[in-house]
């Protein structure tokens, strides 16, 4: 007990937010490390290399149009916008933390995608003949997916950590993501086209576990900044709309060409539409005088896209997608109303953006839906070849049957949860050390410690409880 108390006392020393040495050092050293590692390991794959002409002749490819770039790049554009614009602006709801929301999102995404190309490359794209990682357009999409898990985790600690801590969070988050992704997709052989398990469940519980480890008992000292103003909510809604519009591309980006990709886009499109209506209904129903809460519209309207991710390429059927979206809109909105304050009060989890309701819970639902849909698959619905193609029943898995695949899907979900919680606790212990220049409790949710701000400041109105973005909250 004495050692534990000594560690706590060491971690609770006075805060110093001056990152003039630590942030440049981390950025320079890690970027130089990326340059060296890329020089040693990373090369273009055959479709991006100048030897494409020879490869085309060898494989009897008739036209450059058959290069994977032309199939994947539109989806890559959409996913890239989601990562840098969608996630960034979604987190600008805090009245005095918009620079940090967009700027630090930009920073960790730019670093994370480089590290992700290496980590995922070592697991998936390593050419054992020459020891090089061969990258193409699909690797760029997967790197963005990898980064998404860390951006989700950032939402739980938004406004409470320093940029140096975020870089550390991203370094470990990308590493853990690459390992759990390899275990789930390659060893367990689960299917997860839209990343309900691999991205959202992992990222959600990774962030929540870190937030639990970094619990601040005196965070109410910054309560006047822990909310939104009219303009900041409008900017956050821009992020919502970008995410909502491009989510079908997110869930279908790396599925097989043809029917799988087509089906994934349709299922996501319908689930998202259904979620909007139930979110509005529940938000109005549970608010006094039936007024809508902007936090629900910004976040819960996206939950259907998260939940349909795993089963997006399965024969979920259009009505099934609507049902998934319908349920997620209800569960996510009720989570913001009841679960977020409960978790802060009783579980000591301070979830700034409510990622438990937007990512973690819908990710769990998505994993369960995927397991049930896979187990219920039949040859009469999919066709013999369609069943093999959809679930990749080839090679060592050629004798698998749908019921077994359902069990593998459930196992993949458990792995994602374990990696998220276990990894988050481990990284949270590291981030508790008083060497990262994080803000004091009375200086959270504020851009001032890390950004040069305009001289004229708006008058800050009195604010809110938890993260529900409202000045006067009557429930």
Swiss-Prot record:
Lineage: superkingdom: Eukaryota
InterPro entries xrefs: Ammonium/urea_transptr (IPR029020), NH4_transpt_AmtB-like_dom (IPR024041), RhesusRHD (IPR002229)
GO biological process entries: ammonium homeostasis
Keywords: Ammonia transport, Cell membrane, Glycoprotein, Membrane, Transmembrane, Transmembrane helix, Transport
Spans through the membrane: 21-41, 74-94, 99-119, 139-159, 168-188, 194-214, 234-254, 266-286, 300-320, 322-342, 358-378, 411-431
Purpose: Functions as an ammonia transporter. May play a role in the elimination of ammonia in the gill.
This protein's name: Ammonium transporter Rh type C
Originating organism: Tetraodon nigroviridis (Spotted green pufferfish)
Gene name for this UniProt entry: rhcg
């Amino acid at each position: 007990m004495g050692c534990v108390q000594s560690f706590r006392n060491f971690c609770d020393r006075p805060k110093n937010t001056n990152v003039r040495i630590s942030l440049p050092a981390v950025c320079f050293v890690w970027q130089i490390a990326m340059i060296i590692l890329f020089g040693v390991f990373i090369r273009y794959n055959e479709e991006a290399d100048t030897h494409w002409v020879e490869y085309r002749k060898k494989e009897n490819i008739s036209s450059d149009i058959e290069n994977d770039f032309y199939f994947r790049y539109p989806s890559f554009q959409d996913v890239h916008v989601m990562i840098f614009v969608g996630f960034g602006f979604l987190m600008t709801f805090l009245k005095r933390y918009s620079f940090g929301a967009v700027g630090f999102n930009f920073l960790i995404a730019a670093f994370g995608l480089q590290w992700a190309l290496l980590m995922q490359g070592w697991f998936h794209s390593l050419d054992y003949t020459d020891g090089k990682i061969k990258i193409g357009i699909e690797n760029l999409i997967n790197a963005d997916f990898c980064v998404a898990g860390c951006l989700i985790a950032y939402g739980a600690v938004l406004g409470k950590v320093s940029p140096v801590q975020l870089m550390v969070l991203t370094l470990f988050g990308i590493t853990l993501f690459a390992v759990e992704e390899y275990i789930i997709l390659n060893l367990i052989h689960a299917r997860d086209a839209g990343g309900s398990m691999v991205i959202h469940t992992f990222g959600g519980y990774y962030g929540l576990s870190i937030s639990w480890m970094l619990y601040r008992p005196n965070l109410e000292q910054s309560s006047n900044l822990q909310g939104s103003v009219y303009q900041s909510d409008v900017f956050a809604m821009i992020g919502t709309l970008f995410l909502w519009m491009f989510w079908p591309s997110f869930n279908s980006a790396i599925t097989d060409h043809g029917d799988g990709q087509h089906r994934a886009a349709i299922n996501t499109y319908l689930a998202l539409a259904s979620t909007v209506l139930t979110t509005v209904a529940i938000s109005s129903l549970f608010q006094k005088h039936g007024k809508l809460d902007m936090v629900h519209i910004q976040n819960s309207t996206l939950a259907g896209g998260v939940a349909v991710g795993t089963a997006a390429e399965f024969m979920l059927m259009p009505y099934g997608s609507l049902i998934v979206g319908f349920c997620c809109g209800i569960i996510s909105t009720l989570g913001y109303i009841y679960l977020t304050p409960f978790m802060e009060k009783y579980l000591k989890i301070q979830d700034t953006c409510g990622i438990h309701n937007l990512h973690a819970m819908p990710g769990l639902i998505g994993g369960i839906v995927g397991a049930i849909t896979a187990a219920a698959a039949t040859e009469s619905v999919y066709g013999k070849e369609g069943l093999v193609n959809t679930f990749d029943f080839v090679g060592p898995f050629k004798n698998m049957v749908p019921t077994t695949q359902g069990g593998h899907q459930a196992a993949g979900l458990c792995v994602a949860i374990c990696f998220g919680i276990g990894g988050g606790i481990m990284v949270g212990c590291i981030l508790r050390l008083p060497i990262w220049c994080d803000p004091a409790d009375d200086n959270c949710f504020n851009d001032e410690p890390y950004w040069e701000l305009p001289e004229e400041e708006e008058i800050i109105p009195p604010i809110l409880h938890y993260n529900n973005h409202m000045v006067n909250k009557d429930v």
